[in-house]
Amino acid sequence: MPLGGLGLLQDVIIQLAGIQREPIPIIRPRAAVIFCADNGVVAEGVTQCGQDVTATVTRNMGQGRSTMCMMAKSIDMHVFPVDIGVAGKFSFKGVVDKKIRRGTENIAENAAMTRDEAIAAVKNGIELAENCAQQGFRLVCGGEMGIGNTTTSAAVTAALTGAPASHVTGRGAGLSSEGLYKKMQVVEKSLAINRPKSDDPIDVISKVGGLDIAGLTGFYLGAAACGLPIVLDGVISCTAALAAVRLCPLVADYLIAAHCSEEPASALLLQELGKKAFITAGMHLGEGTGAAAGIALLDLALAPYREMPTFDEIGVEAYKPLK
């Protein structure tokens, strides 16, 4: 094929080969770990649906019936839903129980959680990544489910980057213009009340973040430490990735940006991470679905590397880089 013919996909294949020390990257078996948690900020009316939806979707994930589960099945990817902070006392079949607490506080009034709780959630994420490595998975992605988490991710992004709330707050699952304005005000209020320290990602997450963001942050730290390539999902995933990179810059070498979400913070987060997404499809579903779409494209991109003959084998002069 022509040099650079697969564009960004070729860049990712080269990155994967470097991470794995394999001439042809191996991206099977692969796993998606989905962190499910509730956010007290829903009390501010920043979402279209109620908090109970988190528990419903978490239960469906355990039964293999969510959007992400359907997409993952089509690309032969294992899905591990994790209850890291769903509100209420539940025991979901098929869901890993790593609950730290039953939802967070309302960040427009108080810190989301204590520092110790944030650290515990990060540690749970690290442990889950280590479990993936021990089970032999060669590629991982992280996802989330939690009503209100585009509000917390906007607050965390603003705190880590210094960007104004108006630049990083989006419509989430579907807010009106009036609802979006209210959401921006809530993000601004949460930052003013909690005063997160921008140079301390744990402080930021504990004050204005969520348990899903904390768990994902740990998951990315753990996966990188285990040498696993990580396919990022959307805005919440990238928010956690930035927190992980701020804690350990080497994590960035293991991150692959699948897509740029419709949420306004996504482009800024990818820029901060130094990543270029290879899908721009206006997606904003979450759960890891954007990562799943990216992995499907990587399967396609790897096929010629595995199966095509070389230029020597077909008697054609190879392309040469032109200066």
For the regions a language model picked out, list residue spans one by one.
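N-terminal loops that bind phosphate or other acidic moieties
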Residues: 1-323
